[in-house]
């Protein structure tokens, strides 16, 4: 099986623990005042409405930075999303490119643990994408800790990277499964290891 093919499936219990992913009003996030080396994509957050729409929701967050107002249902059809989730980061890239004129590409992190070179590549890709007001959509599996020590764990999930600080040592994640805490900061190496075995669209 292609290593970047992973389903987005949250258990009902997992969704409840995540605060219930109910799509409420979209929240616009304009770029705040930035420090040196800080960049934010001008995105609009929207939670996923069910346990299997993390792919469409993350793609929608990314497309909002382009000023695209696309429904999650429309994206789900294009992505082939079912109750088993969205198959692949390749599908995310394909659909993002339909709306952006080909700005996205898929990158794999094939190893179980990201190598220093793969971390450096992710860091460079996040910088280039966010500088271009293009959020990164990551396909993750398992658990990772944010900078506050809070663990986030999924049996397969998509989320969006919308901001970085400094030399891209820490990144801000917009997580469509967490409307109660829609964003959190994570070390870029931790994120790379969360993606490991899968891929991302940047």
Feature locations, PLM:
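Active-site-adjacent structural segments surrounding the nucleophilic cysteine of cysteine proteases
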Residues: 1-95, 142, 149-150, 165-168
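Conserved active-site-adjacent core of cysteine acyl-enzyme catalytic domains
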Residues: 74-202
